Amino acid sequence: KKKKPNAVATKRYKSRFFLKKGQVVDILKTEDVVCIRATSGVLSAYDNHGKHHLLTGNSMTELEAQLDPSRFFRVNRSEIVNINYVLSFESYAKETLAVNLQHMSEPLITSKTRTSDFRKWLAT
């Protein structure tokens, strides 16, 4: 019998997005993504230059599973944030927070069900 290796397989997370624009494919590194937002089923990544890019081929849930959970957190049903761009947060409404991000003009609002986990995630 062959022995199974003891090494634990480490999951590899998405490190870049391919953005097709006509015949050209641009590359957006995940480290440059400030947040991802779904609007009417269309996903957009907002980068650290204030630009947004359409993402195709994934649902929000599928995309969330491909991103490193130590760096990305889904704050509500339609938005994911990158921890490296969180500037501050403040109480917003009952059990929700307004999260201020670099390069974004308006805060993102956590859902009631994710607020507690968001605080824990930021503290790790």
Model regions: which residues?
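Basic, polyanion-interacting recognition surfaces, primarily
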Residues: 1-124
